[in-house]
Amino acid sequence: MDNPTFPKHENGTIILGAGMTGLAAGWASGLPVYEAQQSPGGICSSYYMRPGSQERLPQSPENGEVYRFEIGGGHWIFGGDPAILRFIGKLAPAKTYQRISSVYFPHQQLYVPYPLQNHLGYLSKEVRTKALIEMLTGSKGQFRTMQEWLVESFGQTLTGKFFGPFHESYTAGLWKQIAPQDPYKSPIDAALVIRGASEATPPIGYNTYYVYPRQGLNALARAMAQGCDVHYGKRVTRVDFQGKEVHFEDGSRARYTSLISTLPLNRMIEMTGLRLEEAPDPYTSVLVLNIGATRGVKCPNDHWIYLPGSRAGFHRVGFYSNVDVSFLPSSSRAWNNRVSIYIERAYVGGQVPSDQEVQEYSAATVKELQEWKFIEKAEVVDPTWIDVAYTWSWPGSRWRSAALRVLEAHDVQMVGRYARWVFQGIADSIRDGLYVGASNRLSRSC
């Protein structure tokens, strides 16, 4: 077995994970970063594939005849402090986009602009009338579960038509048990609800505008990594609090005095061997199919669409190339005769489909998209798996706070979306990494 690695820095702190948060912390602090993969960025990474090929390429070839995809689907940078957006732009010049998104009802071939509740005029008079009455006059009592919150917020009609079946798929069936989360994603404004029943309404929500690096997320990750001391191929298997050592899958170890961890909170608890009285909160995994195909005659222009259901089981379809044609092979960018797509399907955490199941699902998804005439010939079908993709909580759960508290007591600072078990975007994750990194910066003379 390799001898332990002794970090060559003053305060003995090391960073686990070179996703966006870990890279930001490493960039701001100068501390070493240990990453499981052989490249930076975590799930916020771009890759390339030639039509008809199964090989992932880390960079585009000179001729540009490749589709660009991302691990885990489209990661668009929304919100964020202006200072953070400037930081991103200096490292990787970015473009700004205005969201184009809809709820799509396949059986009716009906597109309703997002958010649904502000565009009731697209629905039938009967549905529109019921939905208005329920949203504006319904009692707003207490609720414990996401299901109860959805019914209280949107009424039985819209919950039955869209919000219920969508969240059944989005949460892999957990929506009837878990606590409500992220209400700002579906804001309720009575004036806009009424107005939207008869006329157009302005876009609202947390991601009406977003930015994305011109050369892909991998360009941002590489630029950040150049300012960091990143050790690749270091997958954490155990954290020994008594010996103050992190054990890696390759047999090596690293000593520390304190840790900055961006790894998922549940995984960190498991690897430390800590035992909590509270039952762990649930999570869902996501199987994302990245598809490159010739464009179908009914392919929408949306950046992404939400679905109340699909035969194959997916709940969201995103169109990389509708955001920017740079996701297409260079010969198709002027003609826009191809499309680069990501399709999301959720699984309860711990339930991993077999290779055979993934193949069957992939074939069923391609067939369904062809029936909808979104695509014609599929030239690339590439599945990616995100183990901890969405984090949830049980009603009244104190697991998250207890886990963070006990790790802090053992000199572990948890930072980032998955480490702190919250929903936040890339910009906020970079901000948190910079803050924590700066507070742990190596001492230097001014």
Question: What function would you assign to each model-found segment?
Answer:
Residues 110, 126-244, 252-255, 262:
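Active-site/ligand-binding neighborhood in enzyme catalytic cores
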Residues 3, 394-446:
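C-terminal lid/capping helical subdomain adjacent to the catalytic/cofactor pocket in oxidative enzymes
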Residues 256-258, 267-410, 424:
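C-terminal segments that line or cap access tunnels to active or ligand-binding sites in enzymes
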Residues 21, 39, 266:
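Conserved Rossmann-like nucleotide-cofactor binding loop
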Residues 55-139, 165:
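Dinucleotide-binding Rossmann-like beta1-alpha1 core, especially the glycine-rich loop
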Residues 6-33:
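N-terminal Rossmann-like FAD-binding beta1-loop-alpha1 element of flavoenzymes
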